[in-house]
A protein has these predicted regions:
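Class I S-adenosyl-L-methionine-dependent methyltransferase catalytic core
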Residues: 1-199
Length: 199
């Protein structure tokens, strides 16, 4: 069973305003509404079982006002539907180029870190060389690693290798990458464009 899952959904965004990037995204790959994202992931979970205690990293769009089918709140709702509790946001700071928005240049992209665990327990991340992902009482699993990724932007929507190193340093496998486009050693990639790139 997979203990760490990365999901980079092809969010459907509205045109114009904060969601102007939608037209750009839809020219690269088919996009999905929140309902379609939940349905697709649920189907994959039935084929690739996820452990009862596991970590989830879900990429989202940096917006609270972009509509019900996009943005941070929509992604948090997807986490809830899948049985994961959102814990924190992990920013990817793009060190080479930003994206223009009505509110200024955007140099970040957000990933939600969420967990699934037994009632009354939490799941700690790797720290101090400890590779356990076992349940520990709430508040006992402290992690001293940084909470952001600093890396260059590459092809449209392609996430940096630094992110996957970050995940592997905090969470243990088996690893599942949904809506994957990159073949990566030690990971199971699933998606229509899986294998498009190599790590």
């Amino acid at each position: 069973m997979y203990k760490t899952i990365v999901i980079d959904p092809p969010w459907k965004k509205s045109t114009g305003g904060v969601g102007h990037a939608t037209l750009q995204a839809s020219t690269h790959y088919p996009v999905q509404t929140v309902g379609e994202v939940v349905s697709t992931i649920s189907d994959w979970f039935s084929r690739y079982p996820v452990a009862p205690e596991s970590h989830l990293y879900m990429w989202t769009i940096n917006s609270f006002t972009a509509g019900k089918d996009q943005g941070i709140l929509a992604a948090m709702n997807v986490c809830d539907h899948l049985g994961f509790k959102p814990i924190t946001l992990i920013p990817w700071v793009k060190s080479n180029v930003g994206s223009p928005t009505p509110y200024g240049m955007r140099y970040t992209e957000m990933c939600i870190f969420a967990v699934r665990y037994r009632k009354g327990h939490g799941i700690r991340t790797r720290y101090s060389g400890n590779s356990d992902i076992e349940s520990v009482p709430n508040g006992k699993g402290l992690c001293s690693s940084k909470d952001f990724i600093l890396a260059d932007r590459r092809q449209h929507s392609r996430k940096p290798e630094e992110f996957y190193k970050f995940v592997e340093s905090r969470s243990r496998g088996p690893y599942l990458d949904l809506y994957s486009r990159t073949t990566r050693p030690g990971w199971k990639g699933v998606g229509n464009e899986s294998g498009k790139w190599k790590a």
